[in-house]
Amino acid sequence: MKKIILAIMTLVLVFGSFVTVRADAPVDVATDGDAEAVVEATALEGGNEALQIQSKSVLLMELESGTVLYEKNADEMLRPASVTKVMTLLLIFEALERGDIALDDTVVVTEHAASMGGSQCFFEAGEEQTVQDMIKCIEVASGNDAAVAMAEHLAGSEAAFVQKMNERAKELGMEHTHFDNACGLEVETHLTSARDIAIMSRQLLLYHPDILTYSTIWMDSITHKTRRGESRFDLANTNKFLNLYTGANGLKTGYTSQAKYCMSATATRDGVTLIAVVMGAETKEVRNSEAMKLLDYGFAQCRTYVDTEVVPEDLQIPVKKGTCKSVPVKPVEQHTITLVAANPDQIEKQVIAYENLKAPIPEGDAVGVVQYSCNGTYIGEVMLYAEYPVPELNFRYSLSDIAGRIFMAK
């Protein structure tokens, strides 16, 4: 539906001058340098001095807006190791949301899944576990066998699931990614980039925040149920970063001899969530320290803006062919926006009503939007909804209205 800016003097007095809002692209900074040596990667224009980064590739992203705050070789295709499982988990949570599976569904481990090497939970063929426990095994213990078991449960085979992984990557705009398996075991053509890892991590966090329930588990356990009986198996979180950085809450680590140390690290402070992707670090100490360095830089750049008066109490949106000429909007208590390298004093907002809004309008129907901009760049919006229904003006109502006016005039 087209939109038109409301030219109402009272709104101008409340909100100030209206400005044109543009949906500009997020800050996207390219970098140069030798990936094998310590180089100065480029940060936000006008930001702090460039960071000293040893890892082959890094990227720092603000969750809410998707703004890239810092990057180095962010589009270089590298081996992601177990960070691959971010996509596996994304597809699992999307299947849960659609109702294709439920957390208490039973997953049967196949011979193929049980044969996975690397990090594993040592399932036996024929063993049964719930979807919820499989998610724990993937997110907490980074179990390759659990990831493949879930892939087969969802798609019938790992190959079919991998096809879905690649299709979803394409849909998300992950232009430097090709998956060959569901767990991240070494395959020459199994590659992705720091930018693409940030994209899928953001998708998982934004739309399936329940992942944090699992990613923040430090210790847990499952029960193996095999032909030999039952036995407890302890799960220890592979992401030790959780205890190293204040506010850390995820998301996935990875290591193979060729991929080196990788991580999609997430942390939240004062309402701001950041994603720091590190790929190709020579040691886990370098991986962790550079994730910390990126997050420290990001939190120094970000702040939270709270608008406590989104719209005036008497705001009315024009309506055509209705029993009244306008409709009030439902009150909006407040709206919070994460600002990246910006001053709250530079924020402007404008009320935009839907063009040619015609009755009938149900209660709660969208009738407009408040858009926020900073230095001319779109940074967010709040939808406006009708506070009560507006019936269509019909012949019977018109006669009644005319009769009422005549009576009142006497």
What are these regions (language model features)?
Residues 13, 25-40, 62-63, 68-71, ...:
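Membrane-proximal envelope biogenesis segments
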Residues 1-2, 80, 131, 395, ...:
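Structural motif marking the loop-to-transmembrane transition
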Residues 10, 44-46, 262:
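A generic local structural motif
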Residues 10, 82-84, 111-113, 125-127, ...:
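A mature extracytoplasmic/lumenal domain signature
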Residues 2-22:
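Sec-dependent N-terminal signal peptides of Gram-positive bacterial secreted proteins and lipoproteins
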Residues 174-178, 186-191, 195-410:
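Domain-terminus/edge residues, biased toward the C-terminal soluble/receptor-binding domains
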Residues 21-209:
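Active-site-adjacent loops and short helices of periplasmic peptidoglycan-processing enzymes
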